[in-house]
Amino acid sequence: MQISLPALLSQLLLGLVNGSFYAILSLGLAVIFGLLNVINFAHGALFMMGAILSWMAMNYFGISYWVMLVAAPVIVGVFGVLIERLLLRWIYKLDHLYGLLLTLGLTLLIEGAFRSVYGVSGLGYDTPELLEGATDVGFMMLPNYRAWVVVASLVVCFATWYLIEKTRLGAYLRAGTENPRLVEAFGINVPLMVTLTYGFGVALAAFAGVLAAPVIQVTPLMGQNLIIVVFAVVVIGGMGSIMGSILTGLGLGIVEGLTKVFYPEASSTVVFLIMVVVLLVRPAGLFGKET
């Protein structure tokens, strides 16, 4: 089978775009699990919530994409803070299954609420005028918006990694997870820190949702299929591993894109095949710590 270079690079770019979404979403999951020890199944619904809030703001109030790129994560982050304070705080000392079931229930409620208003049909979201069109880079036409998605995702992902792994605040977050009493002895409000961490994690999902709105059809169910893949990404990278989630998300997006070129029939399952192999060889994940 002969594949032209532009076609190959186009699929590679598409894989990188999908990988960017995987990276941001899996990063949010890793932050929440690594620091709060909660499996947040509502992540896909909150990703969708960010996209639909952006669509609503644009269509009902004329608020631009750029404003919602900041506003939607803030709104969803505040919603996440309420979820953590009212619901999640009661299950931290229980088995992971309780958190999974609780967030699954939240997913059904959130998706059901939006589906009752908008149905399941796609909602059109125009590409921002500034990023319309494509740039000729010689060997292919590079869509401006897709290039923006990759750049924005990389900046957000590595800024988050730096914040958690290289700053004093990140050190407090990690220490608060392992020994909250010791951190509280230094005057740090650990419960507030935990609440804000969950809010930040779901804000990342909303940010990814706004980024995805012009690329992926906006529907109340848009997070369902994506979140299954993202959970696989987190497992492959290592539960709670920040850098593992970023690199694995980007890498698997590229692998998925190339699989669509050379063996399209396996493109929807290749991530899960890799997950099975990784779990057999290294159960803690590629970047996870063996216990």
Regions found by a protein language model. Name each.
Residues W90-K166, M193-L196, Q217, L258, ...:
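Transmembrane helix-bundle core of multi-pass membrane transporters
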Residues G62-L106, A113, L247-T248, L252, ...:
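Alpha-helical transmembrane segments within multi-pass membrane transporters and channels
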Residues A7, L86, V117, E178-A185, ...:
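Cytosolic-side transmembrane-helix boundaries in multi-pass membrane proteins
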